[in-house]
């Protein structure tokens, strides 16, 4: 027993308290206290002067009972989720569950449902409910009377409750800006009663009939209480400060002694005190009002109404019939309480609870859903938004569209959904919207979306068969000779990009059918079931295991590698036999780029071929070096040592120099580069080399005319002149036989065997709109004849030329132009120009694919067309989306040193097909 009352946790009632409650017989009034609290013990009984034990732990659904001896009321304190301590416990549990994200809407639904269950219990087992919130489910009447019929709770009549409980409202705090007088407090209470009564009547919570009312209100009695005079939860810090001030206050003792002396001189007590009897009476009335204005007295007035039997009579005006009001003894009430607690609270916590009453089963199942009206409201809004979003997507969707269009349509549908959809179910509704739109897209409206070599998706339907892809993107490109421009579809394979288009447009060009084409070596099958080469054979750059063996490997592995290296050296030895008898100034490396200081890691057998050939040609290089530096006057001259021409019969016996054993069953699937195997050839040529006419068709005064080369921008249609100083050095035997030379060669001898070659070179770039222009430097577009200086061409041929450069055409979109052609006008001289272009893209260096570079005929206009698309070993090398000004060579570049010069072979007819690469073209001097 605490102070003057008993307290226990239901249903553990102490035996002595049970005996006292039995002595009350039928005079026990049950008062339920339900509401909110913000203290650690979740105590709402502090206004009644009652507290739980010190070891009490608040829990959801727990009922703490209070009884004061000598009274007729049993107080039930319902601890619910509306208590701050219990809701804090639930929040802690949710936060500790890391697998489930915390959702405030779902959390609020749970605490409200649990509170309403406790409220339902209070409304059925209490006569008076203090500070309650109303949410009684009326359909409890469909099953509760039947289920209570065979239980001890059958005594509480067919209305399944003791009475229509009288609802009282307790406000623990009085407004601080109002005076705490009797008139002010009463005014606040009356105003609040009017507001509450109007609200409850409007929503039919209180009616004129007790059987149809959820709760009852007293007719002529106060049912709102403001705690204005008692500080329930005082600030402990402020209280400690006040105590400290009282302790530190020291009154003046001398002043008190003087007061006592004055009072001693008075003739009678009270002689010097003023007569203020009205003030004392008013203060006494206020003190008396403060003593009487307590929650306990307020509650006892309503308890008295219940004891005398006028509980409902004062609550309902129009119906005078006796309502279902019952007073039970403690044992009967306890049995009734146990039954109601089990039906309304305990069974709801058990999801596996079985019952034969269908109405009760539906109540347990649908209680949370019926109560969460906000959830229904949000669901309705999301349903409206979902319909609006689906309609927006379907109305804007074309017949066929790709992923980018689908994403844009889905984004627009999401915006349409958000105009209506709200609440915690919006994310699930958006996921459903995305699934419906995705299904609509895949239902015969999805595009193929196979990416082209220019990274454009195919626009044809995915579920319909089509022979070839089509992205709908059209480019303007020029033919091999540069005369005719045409529209080309976006290519989807290497053959379309580098071969088929140029073959197709050549049939429409009246110049392409007449020009002399260089025949690049291609694959010639000997069987019908030829195939692409195996990955390791076709792409040795990726076969890093053959670049070198560790020193601690087994001897068997070393022998296998040696045998494999010997097999790869066989075609190289045949080639060395054809070139060993000839001397050259700067021989072309058989690895197509080993003389460019490239990395030799992973080159495999090609590196061995390069080393073997370098050893055999070292003597000729030393001789050439001595001859090229013999005189100081010839520092700016290129020295070409004239060799003794071989006889035609001897050449036929030796055979062509580029005769290398190639595979006739396997082909190279990509472009030829510096480390691809020599015995593998591509199915089609990706390069083009054509002689479009004599050198006289180009005039440096007018540049390239539109009728000859179409699509050039104004001022960017000039070739760059290149003056090359050359000196011929005769072989020993030829010095005694120059009387056998022709007249033209004798004329060159008279000029001292020194030649000044006039070569015209142009690096042509072309964008996807068909605009063509020349470059006069790696970072400068040719703007006219004023940009051409004496050393302008040297900037082009002796520097890395970028593979991509921004097109100078005026357009909102910055188009990238690609290096597509190299124009060469050869001079009239007893020498031939050799071309050996190498394009470096990423880690690959692409070449023409010929063992020996082609030689160009004299006094002719030649055009080298570069590949439209570059493909490496394992992946397509796509052009960059935009060019970084700080790194213009990041997309690729043309290596310098692609031109060479070699003496003219009078026994070789370059007009014959396939002879431009024949003879000793591998022995030439690089310019």
From Swiss-Prot:
Pfam families documented for this protein: Smg8_Smg9
Region of interest: Disordered: 543-581, 611-636, 643-662
Bias (Basic and acidic residues): 644-654
Feature: compositional bias, Acidic residues: 551-566
GO biological process: nuclear-transcribed mRNA catabolic process, nonsense-mediated decay
Amino acid composition bias (Polar residues), ranges on this chain: 613-633
Assigned keywords, A-Z: Nonsense-mediated mRNA decay
Leader sequence residues: none
Matching InterPro entries: SMG8-like
Disulfide bonds: none
Function: Involved in nonsense-mediated decay (NMD) of mRNAs containing premature stop codons. Probable component of kinase complex containing nonC and recruited to stalled ribosomes.
Family: Belongs to the SMG8 family.
Name of the protein described by the UniProt record: Nonsense-mediated mRNA decay factor SMG8
Organism: Drosophila sechellia
């Amino acid at each position: 027993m605490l102070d003057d009352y008993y307290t226990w946790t239901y249903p553990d009632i102490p035996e002595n308290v049970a005996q006292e409650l039995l002595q009350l017989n039928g005079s026990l009034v049950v008062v339920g206290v339900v509401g909110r609290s913000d203290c650690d013990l979740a105590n709402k009984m502090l206004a009644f002067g009652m507290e739980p034990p010190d070891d009490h732990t608040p829990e959801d659904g727990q009922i703490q009972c209070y009884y004061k001896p000598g009274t007729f009321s049993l107080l039930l304190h319902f601890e619910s989720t509306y208590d701050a301590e219990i809701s804090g416990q639930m929040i802690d549990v949710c936060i500790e569950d890391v697998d489930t994200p915390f959702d405030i809407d779902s959390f609020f639904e749970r605490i409200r449902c649990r509170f309403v269950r406790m409220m339902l219990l209070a409304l059925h087992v209490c006569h008076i409910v203090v500070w309650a919130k109303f949410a009684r489910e009326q359909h409890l009447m469909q099953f509760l009377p039947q289920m209570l019929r065979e239980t001890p709770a059958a005594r509480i009549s067919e209305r399944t409750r003791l009475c229509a409980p009288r609802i009282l409202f307790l406000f623990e705090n009085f407004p601080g800006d109002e005076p705490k007088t009797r008139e002010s407090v009463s005014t606040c209470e009356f105003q609040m009663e009017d507001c509450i009564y109007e609200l409850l009547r409007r929503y039919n919570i209180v009616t004129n009939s007790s059987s149809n009312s959820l709760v009852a209100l007293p007719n002529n009695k106060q049912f709102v209480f403001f705690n204005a005079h008692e500080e329930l939860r005082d600030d402990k810090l402020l209280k400690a400060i006040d105590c400290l001030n009282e302790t530190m206050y020291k009154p003046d003792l001398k002043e008190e002694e003087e007061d006592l002396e004055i009072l001693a001189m008075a003739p009678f007590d009270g002689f010097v005190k003023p007569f203020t009897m009205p003030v004392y009476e008013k203060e006494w009335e206020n003190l008396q009002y403060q003593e009487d204005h307590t929650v306990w007295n307020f509650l006892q007035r309503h308890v008295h109404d219940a004891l005398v039997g006028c509980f409902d009579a004062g609550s309902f005006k129009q119906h005078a019939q006796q309502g279902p009001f019952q007073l039970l003894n403690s044992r009967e009430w306890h049995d009734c309480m146990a039954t109601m607690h089990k039906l309304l609270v305990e069974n709801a916590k058990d999801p596996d609870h079985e019952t034969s009453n269908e109405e009760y089963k539906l109540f347990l199942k649908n209680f949370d859903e019926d109560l969460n009206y906000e959830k229904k409201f949000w669901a309705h809004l999301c349903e409206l938004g979902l319909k609006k979003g689906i309609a927006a997507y379907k109305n804007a969707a074309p017949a066929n569209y790709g992923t980018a269009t689908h994403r844009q349509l889905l984004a627009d549908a999401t915006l349409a959904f958000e105009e209506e959809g709200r609440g915690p179910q919006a994310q699930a509704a958006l996921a459903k919207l995305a699934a419906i739109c995705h299904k609509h897209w895949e239902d015969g409206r999805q595009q193929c979306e196979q990416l082209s070599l220019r990274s454009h998706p195919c626009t044809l339907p995915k579920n319909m068969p089509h022979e070839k892809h089509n992205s709908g993107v059209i480019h303007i490109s020029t033919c091999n000779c540069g005369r005719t421009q045409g529209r080309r579809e976006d290519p989807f394979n290497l053959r379309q990009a580098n071969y088929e288009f140029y073959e197709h447009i050549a049939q429409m060009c009246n110049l392409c059918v007449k020009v002399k084409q260089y025949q690049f070596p291609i694959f010639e099958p000997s069987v019908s079931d030829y195939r692409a080469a195996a990955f390791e054979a076709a792409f040795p750059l990726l076969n890093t295991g053959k670049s070198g063996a560790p020193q601690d490997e087994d001897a068997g592995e070393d022998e296998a590698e040696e045998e494999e290296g010997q097999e790869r050296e066989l075609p190289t030895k045949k080639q060395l036999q054809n070139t060993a008898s000839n001397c050259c100034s700067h021989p072309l490396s058989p690895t197509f780029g080993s003389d460019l200081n490239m990395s030799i890691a992973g080159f495999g057998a090609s590196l061995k071929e390069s080393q073997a050939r370098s050893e055999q040609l070292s003597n000729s290089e030393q001789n050439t070096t001595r001859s090229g530096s013999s005189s100081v006057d010839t520092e700016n001259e290129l020295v070409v040592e004239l060799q003794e021409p071989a006889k035609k019969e001897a050449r036929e016996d030796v055979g062509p120099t580029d005769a290398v054993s190639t595979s006739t069953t396997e082909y190279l699937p990509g472009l030829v580069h510096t480390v691809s195997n020599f015995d593998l050839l591509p199915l089609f040529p990706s390069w083009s080399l054509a002689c479009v006419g004599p050198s006289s068709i180009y005039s440096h005064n007018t540049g390239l005319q539109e009728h000859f080369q179409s699509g050039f921008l104004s001022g960017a249609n000039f070739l760059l002149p290149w003056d090359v100083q050359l000196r011929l050095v005769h072989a020993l035997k030829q010095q005694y036989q120059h009387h056998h030379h022709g007249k033209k060669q004798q004329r060159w001898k008279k000029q001292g065997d020194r030649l000044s070659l006039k070569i015209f070179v142009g690096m042509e770039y072309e964008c996807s709109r068909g605009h063509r222009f020349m470059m006069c430097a790696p970072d400068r577009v040719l703007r006219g004849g004023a940009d051409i200086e004496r050393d302008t061409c040297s900037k082009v041929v002796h520097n890395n030329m970028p593979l991509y450069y921004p097109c100078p055409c005026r357009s909102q979109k910055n188009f990238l132009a690609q290096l597509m052609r190299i124009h060469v006008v050869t001079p009239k001289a007893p020498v031939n120009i050799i071309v050996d272009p190498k394009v470096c893209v990423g880690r690959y260096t692409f070449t023409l694919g010929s063992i020996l570079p082609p030689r160009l005929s004299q006094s002719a206009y030649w055009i080298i067309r570069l590949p439209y698309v570059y493909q490496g070993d394992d992946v397509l090398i796509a052009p960059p989306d935009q060019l970084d000004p700080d790194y213009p060579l990041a997309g690729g570049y043309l290596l310098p040193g692609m031109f060479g010069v070699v003496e003219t072979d009078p026994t070789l007819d370059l007009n014959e097909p396939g002879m431009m690469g024949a003879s000793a073209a591998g022995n030439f001097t690089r310019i």
